[in-house]
Amino acid sequence: VTLNLYNTLARAKQAFAPIDPNHVRMYVCGPTVYDLIHIGNARPIVIFDVLFRLLTHSFPKTTYVRNITDVDDKINARALETGVNIRQLTTETTERFHQDAAALGALEPDVEPRATDHIIEMIALIERLIESGNAYATDDGHVLFHVPSMPSYGRLSGRNRDELIAGARVEVASYKKDPADFVLWKPSNPELPGWESPWGPNKGRGRPGWHVECSAMSQKHLGDDFDIHGGGVDLVFPHHENEIAQSLCGNPGTHFAKYWVHNGYLMSEGEKMSKSLGNFYTVRDLLEEFPGEALRLTLLQTHYRRPLDFTKDGLRQAKATLDRFYGALRDQRGVKTTVDAHPDVLAALEDDLNTPLAVRRLHGLLDDFNDVLRRDAVNGEDGALLSAGRMLGLLQQDPEEWFRWSPTNANTLGEVEIDTMVAARRKARADRDFAEADRIRDELVDAGVILEDKPDETIWRRK
């Protein structure tokens, strides 16, 4: 296997050499569950799903861990704003996240740890950091990582300490020894989630800072050293930089993650996504208008490290593209075949997840498939197309199901009504009542249903 990945830590594309060739380990930062995910959040879900598929195909064993952050100040603020109980808010939001990820065609990770289940591990890591002199506790119950104690801090983002302070809206608090120091643990008042700890008043009742959560969860489920740490480029600083600091200083002699993989920013309709501009799309809103697979294809048509300009026009084009693929698969009436992933598509993915090239090569396989279908619809083998699609998480639906999908908010005919009208038209044609047959066809066209007359049947699909 010659897999090459761009490693943010090395600023270069590198040949992927796992620590244990028989067991690849990957950790990806998951959602903070206070709100529905938007299309920007969907990008890492889809990108790291493709990487997971590729690793699973290429290595004997892969463990993919993606966490749920269910303790955070954003969650506390949303619960206060809506009057919803915090546990109810995080449980319901997590469930919606799972539904949206499934609609995007993402496989479930092997492990999905929740931050609140790992408080003991977080406290243990913080205690080690205090013992090593890398962290300090204040009288009021704050514990902070002391950034000057780590000379190599800033290596991932490539910025020095002063630049980091200027570039991040660092909270300058009186309890900090240095403006760059960041919170590992903070005190909680009675209204907020909290756990007993060794620091501060009220039995040290407090809650973890954001960064310490991922350090503790990745170590628990993947060990001190693992292969890949992934996330959006917006997490490079401060989140991933701070994870490195905590993990290396809290576990001396270890290396933490070997390869750091980050997907690029997402624009929406040519601008930064914002509710005030009307270009803020939640995945859930988009799924009312488009099938999830069209969202997935749209996200795969730009290389993962490049900025992606997401548009509804792009989604419409992706839907039309998938209509062509599924139309060909539906026309193939022979035996379904199973073959290994196509080498051309694999080669594209092994070159730093070049999904745009992989999608182009999928189009080439479609052309080959259509050539065979024109000669012999019964023996056209769909195995190459389906196995290549599987690596990208595409083309795995039943073609009939694909064409029967309709927007949630559309005033459309139901499947039973359409089937009844198609049968009535077939009878009218058999009775040579062509005026009635045309009337039914026109009514279906007006309702967004397209008919295709085959020698022995009529099949339909929605526009």
Question: Model segments located where?
Answer:
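Short phosphate-binding/catalytic loops that engage adenosine nucleotides
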Residues: P60, N134, V449
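Short Gly/Ser/Thr- and Asp/Glu-enriched loop/turn motifs at secondary-structure junctions
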Residues: P21, E108, T138-D140, D453-E457
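Alpha-helical recognition segments enriched in aromatics with Gly/Pro capping
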Residues: V1-Y34, D49, Q99, I120-V335
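N-terminal, positively charged nucleic-acid-binding surface of large information/translation enzymes
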Residues: A10-K13, I19-L107, W460
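Structural preference for alpha-helix termini/caps and helix-kink/transition segments
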Residues: K272-S274, G278-K463
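Short catalytic-loop micro-motif centered on adjacent basic/acidic residues
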Residues: Y64, P109-P113, H229-G231, R374
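Short, glycine/charge-rich beta-strand/loop segments that flank catalytic centers
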Residues: I68-D73, T94-F97, L107-M122, D140-S149
